[in-house]
């Protein structure tokens, strides 16, 4: 079995055809490895923009891709053709789903369908790595994962597609376990895969929603582990509910914060606690930026 870890860079631009903003892919970077995670080949292609004429200042600063590089790039359709050959029958991996969604968006623009017929097997590498290093309330970025795993990133160009794919590989190597990886395989030839990718995560903000359970609203005391009692009503703020709690066993008081996200798989409950004199840390707000 072979794996291809893909990273993309794209530029947010306005599309007249779509009458809206569009994430135009400007660079492909990928690394192919065998079942021992030894590198077999790498892939790097810059795409000449055909929708937006200028890169946003944010993309310029992040990627350092020059106008000269873009001018020498290939068309998007040519880039995809090259990547198809590179991918072959390998299992595709990306860090999170944003790259897959960008591929689907660009495929829809150029071919009229968002189905990626050249992808058979898929693994969300971010989800796989989070099973070990999981911080409650937020997704793990690639740089954070590398830092937690003690990976030396010197000499790598962050936010360049090939280097980011190699960094993702380094994380994968540290955590690889053949048996533990199996549950993360997805069949990208099935309708269910695209239904899942298209599903928009939403924040549930009605406590009477039948999808929510009473047990989800309980908190354990962070000091002694006993079930705490809520003091007062729930307050909804910054996309989450919060309330004061007191432990009947040790008398400890703390603030509890809870967020409900409706994902394709169902409701995901995320909780944080903090001492009463503190505000709960802003993990959940940060998660909103890239959660899917």
Region roles according to the model:
Residues 1-27, 31-36:
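Entry/capping segment at the start of metal-dependent catalytic domains
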Residues 10-12, 49, 129, 232-234:
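Short, well-ordered turn and helix-capping elements at secondary-structure junctions
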Residues 19, 69-72, 135:
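Alpha-helix initiation/capping motif
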Residues 21-26, 32-63, 84-204:
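Metal-dependent phosphoesterase core characteristic of DEDDh/y 3'-5' exonuclease domains
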Residues 174-292:
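Acidic two-metal-ion nuclease catalytic site recognized across multiple nuclease folds
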